[in-house]
Amino acid sequence: MENFFALIIGVGGDLAATAEDATAIKNLLCDPNKGGYLPENIAFLVNDDSTKKNVIDSLENIISKTKKLDKATVLVYYSGHGLQIPNDADPEKTEYFLKTSGADKLKKEETMLNGALFSEKIKQIKADKLLILLDCCHADGMKYKNISELEGMMIEEKPSNRGLLEKLDSGEGRVFISACDDNEESVILPGSKNSLFTEVCLEVFDGKLSPNDEFVSVVDLMYYVIKEVPKRVLPFHHIQRPIISEVHHLSPDYFVCRNGNYKPVQKDLEDFLINNSAERIDFIKNYNNKI
Protein backbone atom coordinates (compact mmCIF):
# COMPACT_ATOMS: atom_id res chain seq x y z
CA MET A 1 0.00 0.00 0.00
CA GLU A 2 3.04 2.30 -0.25
CA ASN A 3 1.67 3.83 -3.47
CA PHE A 4 -1.70 4.79 -1.94
CA PHE A 5 -2.08 8.46 -0.99
CA ALA A 6 -4.92 10.49 0.53
CA LEU A 7 -5.79 14.11 1.24
CA ILE A 8 -8.58 14.35 3.80
CA ILE A 9 -10.18 17.74 4.53
CA GLY A 10 -12.82 18.64 7.12
CA VAL A 11 -13.46 22.37 7.35
CA GLY A 12 -15.02 22.30 10.83
CA GLY A 13 -15.91 25.64 12.43
CA ASP A 14 -19.64 26.24 12.04
CA LEU A 15 -19.74 22.91 10.22
CA ALA A 16 -18.37 20.91 13.17
CA ALA A 17 -19.69 17.63 11.78
CA THR A 18 -17.39 17.97 8.77
CA ALA A 19 -14.32 17.63 10.98
CA GLU A 20 -15.85 14.54 12.58
CA ASP A 21 -16.54 13.06 9.15
CA ALA A 22 -12.98 13.68 7.98
CA THR A 23 -11.57 12.23 11.20
CA ALA A 24 -13.63 9.06 10.79
CA ILE A 25 -12.40 8.62 7.20
CA LYS A 26 -8.78 9.18 8.23
CA ASN A 27 -8.94 6.83 11.21
CA LEU A 28 -10.30 3.99 9.10
CA LEU A 29 -7.94 4.46 6.16
CA CYS A 30 -4.74 4.68 8.22
CA ASP A 31 -5.65 1.81 10.54
CA PRO A 32 -3.17 -0.97 9.65
CA ASN A 33 -5.87 -3.54 10.39
CA LYS A 34 -8.43 -1.84 8.16
CA GLY A 35 -7.74 0.59 5.29
CA GLY A 36 -4.00 -0.02 5.34
CA TYR A 37 -2.77 3.41 4.18
CA LEU A 38 0.63 4.43 5.53
CA PRO A 39 0.19 7.35 7.98
CA GLU A 40 2.90 9.33 6.16
CA ASN A 41 0.89 9.05 2.94
CA ILE A 42 -2.17 10.76 4.41
CA ALA A 43 -2.47 14.55 4.59
CA PHE A 44 -5.10 15.32 7.22
CA LEU A 45 -6.47 18.88 7.40
CA VAL A 46 -9.31 19.72 9.79
CA ASN A 47 -10.56 22.84 11.56
CA ASP A 48 -7.86 25.56 11.63
CA ASP A 49 -5.48 23.43 9.57
CA SER A 50 -7.87 23.31 6.60
CA THR A 51 -6.71 26.61 5.11
CA LYS A 52 -6.49 27.24 1.39
CA LYS A 53 -2.68 27.32 1.62
CA ASN A 54 -2.48 23.99 3.42
CA VAL A 55 -4.84 22.36 0.93
CA ILE A 56 -2.78 23.59 -2.03
CA ASP A 57 0.50 22.60 -0.35
CA SER A 58 -0.86 19.11 0.32
CA LEU A 59 -2.05 18.71 -3.28
CA GLU A 60 1.35 19.83 -4.57
CA ASN A 61 3.04 17.32 -2.29
CA ILE A 62 0.90 14.53 -3.75
CA ILE A 63 1.66 15.81 -7.27
CA SER A 64 5.39 15.66 -6.50
CA LYS A 65 5.23 12.14 -5.05
CA THR A 66 3.09 10.62 -7.80
CA LYS A 67 5.33 11.99 -10.57
CA LYS A 68 8.01 9.56 -9.43
CA LEU A 69 5.78 6.48 -9.50
CA ASP A 70 4.66 4.23 -12.33
CA LYS A 71 1.37 3.52 -10.62
CA ALA A 72 -0.38 5.29 -7.76
CA THR A 73 -3.82 5.51 -6.19
CA VAL A 74 -4.94 8.87 -4.81
CA LEU A 75 -8.04 9.64 -2.74
CA VAL A 76 -9.14 13.23 -2.05
CA TYR A 77 -11.97 13.64 0.45
CA TYR A 78 -13.49 17.05 1.22
CA SER A 79 -16.20 17.67 3.81
CA GLY A 80 -17.39 21.26 3.96
CA HIS A 81 -19.37 23.63 1.80
CA GLY A 82 -19.28 24.52 -1.88
CA LEU A 83 -20.39 27.85 -3.31
CA GLN A 84 -21.35 29.15 -6.72
CA ILE A 85 -20.64 32.89 -6.82
CA PRO A 86 -21.02 35.51 -9.59
CA ASN A 87 -17.68 36.83 -10.85
CA ASP A 88 -16.75 40.26 -9.46
CA ALA A 89 -15.82 41.67 -12.86
CA ASP A 90 -18.60 39.99 -14.82
CA PRO A 91 -21.70 39.00 -12.79
CA GLU A 92 -22.95 37.00 -15.78
CA LYS A 93 -20.12 34.54 -15.19
CA THR A 94 -20.08 32.15 -12.26
CA GLU A 95 -17.15 31.00 -10.15
CA TYR A 96 -17.04 27.94 -7.94
CA PHE A 97 -15.41 27.80 -4.53
CA LEU A 98 -14.78 25.28 -1.77
CA LYS A 99 -14.89 26.84 1.68
CA THR A 100 -11.66 26.50 3.66
CA SER A 101 -10.73 27.56 7.18
CA GLY A 102 -10.52 31.33 7.60
CA ALA A 103 -12.94 32.07 4.74
CA ASP A 104 -13.34 35.84 4.37
CA LYS A 105 -16.27 37.26 2.41
CA LEU A 106 -14.12 40.17 1.22
CA LYS A 107 -11.14 38.03 0.22
CA LYS A 108 -12.66 34.95 -1.32
CA GLU A 109 -9.80 34.31 -3.77
CA GLU A 110 -7.23 34.48 -0.96
CA THR A 111 -9.17 32.54 1.66
CA MET A 112 -11.31 30.04 -0.27
CA LEU A 113 -10.36 27.44 -2.85
CA ASN A 114 -11.42 28.45 -6.35
CA GLY A 115 -12.84 25.49 -8.25
CA ALA A 116 -10.66 26.29 -11.27
CA LEU A 117 -7.51 26.14 -9.15
CA PHE A 118 -8.66 22.93 -7.47
CA SER A 119 -9.33 21.38 -10.89
CA GLU A 120 -5.91 22.50 -12.14
CA LYS A 121 -4.14 20.81 -9.22
CA ILE A 122 -6.19 17.63 -9.60
CA LYS A 123 -5.23 17.44 -13.29
CA GLN A 124 -1.56 17.54 -12.32
CA ILE A 125 -1.82 14.40 -10.18
CA LYS A 126 -0.21 11.61 -12.20
CA ALA A 127 -2.09 8.70 -10.70
CA ASP A 128 -3.62 5.88 -12.69
CA LYS A 129 -6.41 5.74 -10.10
CA LEU A 130 -7.88 8.95 -8.67
CA LEU A 131 -10.96 9.15 -6.45
CA ILE A 132 -12.52 12.50 -5.44
CA LEU A 133 -15.24 12.51 -2.76
CA LEU A 134 -17.05 15.80 -2.11
CA ASP A 135 -19.39 15.91 0.89
CA CYS A 136 -20.71 19.45 0.53
CA CYS A 137 -23.89 21.37 1.40
CA HIS A 138 -24.32 19.88 4.85
CA ALA A 139 -27.53 19.74 6.81
CA ASP A 140 -27.26 18.66 10.44
CA GLY A 141 -30.10 16.57 11.84
CA MET A 142 -32.09 17.17 8.63
CA LYS A 143 -31.76 20.94 9.09
CA TYR A 144 -29.54 23.20 7.00
CA LYS A 145 -26.45 24.55 8.76
CA ASN A 146 -25.62 28.20 8.19
CA ILE A 147 -22.04 29.37 7.77
CA SER A 148 -21.65 32.55 9.82
CA GLU A 149 -18.39 33.58 8.13
CA LEU A 150 -20.25 33.91 4.85
CA GLU A 151 -23.38 35.59 6.14
CA GLY A 152 -24.00 39.05 4.79
CA MET A 153 -22.22 38.48 1.49
CA MET A 154 -23.63 40.88 -1.07
CA ILE A 155 -23.64 38.11 -3.64
CA GLU A 156 -25.92 35.29 -4.60
CA GLU A 157 -24.66 32.04 -3.10
CA LYS A 158 -25.71 28.76 -4.62
CA PRO A 159 -24.50 25.21 -4.05
CA SER A 160 -21.81 24.25 -6.53
CA ASN A 161 -21.52 20.46 -6.53
CA ARG A 162 -22.38 19.96 -10.20
CA GLY A 163 -20.33 22.94 -11.36
CA LEU A 164 -17.28 21.77 -9.45
CA LEU A 165 -17.50 18.25 -10.82
CA GLU A 166 -17.88 19.58 -14.35
CA LYS A 167 -14.57 21.41 -13.96
CA LEU A 168 -12.74 18.19 -13.18
CA ASP A 169 -11.39 16.19 -16.10
CA SER A 170 -12.92 12.74 -16.14
CA GLY A 171 -11.33 9.78 -17.83
CA GLU A 172 -10.21 6.24 -17.28
CA GLY A 173 -9.27 5.67 -13.65
CA ARG A 174 -10.75 8.99 -12.50
CA VAL A 175 -13.86 8.77 -10.35
CA PHE A 176 -15.64 11.79 -8.86
CA ILE A 177 -18.54 11.50 -6.43
CA SER A 178 -20.51 14.32 -4.80
CA ALA A 179 -22.83 13.70 -1.85
CA CYS A 180 -25.84 15.44 -3.42
CA ASP A 181 -27.10 17.53 -6.31
CA ASP A 182 -27.19 21.34 -6.28
CA ASN A 183 -30.78 21.65 -5.09
CA GLU A 184 -30.27 19.11 -2.30
CA GLU A 185 -28.50 18.86 1.06
CA SER A 186 -26.08 16.32 2.48
CA VAL A 187 -27.87 15.23 5.64
CA ILE A 188 -26.98 13.72 8.98
CA LEU A 189 -29.77 11.35 9.90
CA PRO A 190 -31.17 11.47 13.45
CA GLY A 191 -29.00 9.44 15.80
CA SER A 192 -26.04 9.37 13.43
CA LYS A 193 -22.63 10.85 14.15
CA ASN A 194 -21.59 11.29 10.52
CA SER A 195 -23.27 12.61 7.41
CA LEU A 196 -25.20 9.92 5.55
CA PHE A 197 -22.85 10.11 2.57
CA THR A 198 -19.76 9.68 4.75
CA GLU A 199 -21.47 6.99 6.80
CA VAL A 200 -22.14 4.95 3.67
CA CYS A 201 -18.56 5.48 2.43
CA LEU A 202 -17.24 4.25 5.78
CA GLU A 203 -19.38 1.12 5.57
CA VAL A 204 -17.93 0.31 2.15
CA PHE A 205 -14.34 1.07 3.23
CA ASP A 206 -14.89 -1.29 6.16
CA GLY A 207 -15.74 -4.13 3.78
CA LYS A 208 -19.47 -4.41 4.37
CA LEU A 209 -20.27 -5.19 0.74
CA SER A 210 -17.60 -7.74 -0.06
CA PRO A 211 -16.27 -9.47 3.07
CA ASN A 212 -14.61 -12.18 0.96
CA ASP A 213 -12.51 -9.67 -1.01
CA GLU A 214 -9.13 -8.64 0.34
CA PHE A 215 -9.49 -5.11 -1.06
CA VAL A 216 -12.39 -2.67 -1.39
CA SER A 217 -13.19 -1.72 -4.99
CA VAL A 218 -14.41 1.59 -6.37
CA VAL A 219 -17.22 -0.38 -8.03
CA ASP A 220 -18.49 -1.35 -4.58
CA LEU A 221 -18.20 2.26 -3.42
CA MET A 222 -20.08 3.80 -6.35
CA TYR A 223 -22.75 1.12 -6.32
CA TYR A 224 -23.45 1.34 -2.59
CA VAL A 225 -23.40 5.15 -2.42
CA ILE A 226 -25.87 5.70 -5.26
CA LYS A 227 -28.09 2.87 -4.02
CA GLU A 228 -28.12 3.48 -0.27
CA VAL A 229 -28.05 7.27 0.13
CA PRO A 230 -31.31 7.97 -1.80
CA LYS A 231 -32.99 4.98 -0.12
CA ARG A 232 -32.10 5.89 3.46
CA VAL A 233 -33.45 9.45 3.28
CA LEU A 234 -36.85 8.41 1.90
CA PRO A 235 -38.44 7.75 5.33
CA PHE A 236 -37.64 11.39 6.17
CA HIS A 237 -39.34 12.71 3.00
CA HIS A 238 -36.00 14.00 1.80
CA ILE A 239 -34.29 13.69 -1.58
CA GLN A 240 -30.53 13.21 -1.80
CA ARG A 241 -29.03 11.84 -5.01
CA PRO A 242 -25.24 11.70 -5.20
CA ILE A 243 -23.67 12.86 -8.46
CA ILE A 244 -21.09 10.59 -10.06
CA SER A 245 -18.79 11.09 -13.01
CA GLU A 246 -19.27 9.05 -16.16
CA VAL A 247 -16.52 6.42 -16.02
CA HIS A 248 -15.54 4.43 -19.08
CA HIS A 249 -13.92 1.01 -18.72
CA LEU A 250 -14.83 0.80 -15.03
CA SER A 251 -12.79 -2.05 -13.61
CA PRO A 252 -13.58 -4.22 -10.56
CA ASP A 253 -9.80 -4.24 -9.98
CA TYR A 254 -9.79 -0.53 -9.12
CA PHE A 255 -9.10 -0.79 -5.39
CA VAL A 256 -9.60 2.01 -2.85
CA CYS A 257 -8.23 0.46 0.33
CA ARG A 258 -7.66 -2.80 2.16
CA ASN A 259 -10.70 -4.62 3.54
CA GLY A 260 -10.33 -4.71 7.32
CA ASN A 261 -13.09 -7.30 7.63
CA TYR A 262 -11.65 -9.63 5.02
CA LYS A 263 -12.69 -13.22 5.64
CA PRO A 264 -10.92 -15.60 3.25
CA VAL A 265 -13.02 -18.43 1.91
CA GLN A 266 -11.92 -22.03 2.23
CA LYS A 267 -10.22 -23.28 -0.93
CA ASP A 268 -12.87 -25.92 -1.55
CA LEU A 269 -15.61 -23.27 -1.48
CA GLU A 270 -14.02 -20.71 -3.84
CA ASP A 271 -15.88 -22.06 -6.88
CA PHE A 272 -19.19 -21.30 -5.16
CA LEU A 273 -18.49 -17.59 -4.62
CA ILE A 274 -20.81 -15.21 -6.48
CA ASN A 275 -19.10 -12.31 -8.26
CA ASN A 276 -21.46 -9.31 -8.21
CA SER A 277 -19.13 -6.94 -10.10
CA ALA A 278 -20.90 -7.13 -13.47
CA GLU A 279 -24.31 -6.54 -11.90
CA ARG A 280 -23.00 -3.58 -9.90
CA ILE A 281 -21.27 -2.05 -12.92
CA ASP A 282 -24.56 -2.27 -14.86
CA PHE A 283 -26.36 -0.57 -11.96
CA ILE A 284 -23.80 2.26 -12.05
CA LYS A 285 -24.08 2.60 -15.84
CA ASN A 286 -27.87 2.94 -15.59
CA TYR A 287 -27.74 5.55 -12.82
CA ASN A 288 -29.03 8.83 -14.26
CA ASN A 289 -27.47 11.52 -12.03
CA LYS A 290 -24.10 11.80 -13.74
CA ILE A 291 -21.70 14.40 -15.04
What residues fall within each predicted segment?
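Cysteine endopeptidase catalytic domains of the caspase/legumain-like
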Residues: 1-290
